[in-house]
């Protein structure tokens, strides 16, 4: 130890006598022997810091001190000594004596005596005051007066700058000289002109900072499902696009294997994380421009040949707003044939609320593979990321109507399945057999036709567009399941539920926010929440639903033509008969009412 210490000292050029006082006191045994006493400088004794002297400490009064207790009226009197000639008052007796000299009255000034003057102390007349005790009496008449004014009197003087009041005029004058000239700045940036206000505010800020240090509430500590649209709040495009769907805090944690098998499955059980896990910032692309999509591959068949393409769905796109209606519909109708994670192949597998657990569904449901070969896993939405643990489609972006990772994050609340928007049933994919697309469309049309009669001949109020969308995805998701299904099905058979966006036919109906071209004769009371009514009607190869609709329209047209022909024929017959009556003179000619209704007798 000594050798290492000496070597270190020689290396750094420190002498041995200078190194001795650097060692701790408990290492004296290992330290080298101290130098001779004449080399040590005596350390100065540590002086304790002087204690602050307290003012007006309680003490035993002098036995010879005169204790004077004045009344409040006497203390507050401004003129105690009054001249008997002119009734002028003075505060001091000396001033009165000098005044008497002007009246040629005998006057006498107090002379300083060589004898020791008896000390006087004054008590505060307020019983609750600490200076009411003789041991705390004040030894100055002016001091006791100012004390009584400040603590127990009325504050008559007011500062014009800060509105602070003072009871003593001298205090008010001193404050007026410094008010507004000095500023007190807090660490938070607040400025104060008064020191007392600054001290109070700074104490509050310090307490708040300590409380915040004990309980941090930063935004990064919150779960990511509180921000379903990503945490880039400075991007105006993300802010505008995030208003499209107000989806937050939907669903409770359920079993990962449970997936709803409804006709319109708006979200199913998602995995808790895996190879295809993505943050919620992938929901909306940075260049997303509202309802319009990018126009990269206008051909649908070319779209199928690309396995690694960008998001071209409803919410992902560039700033290319001006698109043709055909390209707009093609972008909406794009779905890939490479969807290997065989989720339940429902008609509208709208899993934009949460991803499906593609691993369990692919391994436990053998019918899903066959159904996926017919409908490519789903009819409208491609489920490339249809789960956090998806097997296939990991390299592709979403090309469906909505990106599948709308609610995906590491802390997503949809660790289980989310309740469906149109049904509250939570069932396993194996609980019900899969139906074909044609059968499901026919079933949906039958369910929608039951409530379509109540919605004829009325328009949708444009002011309720945004609120109805939010209600449909928010508060109404649990209480209006069945009615929402029927209302959405009604939009399939409603030809007037499409809007017009700057000359482009929008399939979102009256919920696009710009449906200015709707007329009163169109049936727009049905609520097309997802805008799939026009898309389904324009789909090719959708089974017997389109043919059935065309047949119904043809039958209605034939009935209308038949009725018009009968009316024309009956009106012509009535005209001939009336002319015959006039020519033959067989009675007064009867005028034929419209639609061939006769009242003439032959």
UniProtKB/Swiss-Prot annotation:
Effects seen without this gene: Down-regulation of SS4 during the light period of both short and long day conditions. Deformity of the chloroplasts and their contained starch granules, with an increased number of starch granules per chloroplast.
Report whether Repeat shows up as a keyword of the record. yes
Q: Report the source organism.
A: Arabidopsis thaliana
This protein is called what? Answer: Protein indeterminate-domain 5, chloroplastic
Q: Where in the cell is it found?
A: Plastid, Chloroplast
Q: Which gene encodes it?
A: IDD5
**PANTHER family under this entry?**
PROTEIN INDETERMINATE-DOMAIN 5, CHLOROPLASTIC, SERINE/THREONINE-PROTEIN KINASE RIO
Q: Where is this region: SHR-binding?
A: 194-206
Residues with PTM Phosphoserine: 71
